[in-house]
Amino acid sequence: MWTKSYSVTTKEVTKEQIWKLTTDIDHWKNWDETVEDSKLLGEFKVGEYFMLKPKGGPKVKIKLVEIIPFKKFTDQTSFPLAKMYGEHFYEETEDGLKITVTMTMKGLLSKIWIKLVANDIVKSLPEDIINQIKNAKKL
């Protein structure tokens, strides 16, 4: 198993603002520079799916596997002989809202999918979270 996390603590946004932004999957392309298109297939609830088209990559179907409103959601992307999980965690602290994204890859071919997909996602996390904060402030 491979896991990488990135966190930022900020007083610029509330958990309600960041939750509204990040759970509005259909509009990710408006603030996430790595996303060409995204579409929620149904409702934002466990067991539902969304389609994601990263810039320069193929369209993928992603499943919502855990949701705790205003605290956390986790999605799962299935690859041949591997699964990738993206955990989006929001924690109120004395220093502000701590925003953490953790990417995890499991499976027999995880090393291949880490090189092909996960490393690029992790590299973009600092900029992605800054963009989330900037855009959530407008809500």
What does each model-identified segment do?
Residues M1-G42:
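Hydrophobic ligand-binding cavity/cleft-lining segments
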Residues M1-K4, D37, K63, K98-T102:
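N-proximal short alpha-helices
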Residues W2-K4, P58, K71, M84, ...:
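Residues at beta-strand starts and edge strands
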Residues T10, K29-N30, K39-L81, Y85, ...:
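Glycine-rich portal/gate segments that line the openings of hydrophobic small-molecule binding cavities
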Residues E12-E16, V65-F70, F89-K98:
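A short, structured loop/turn motif at beta-sheet edges
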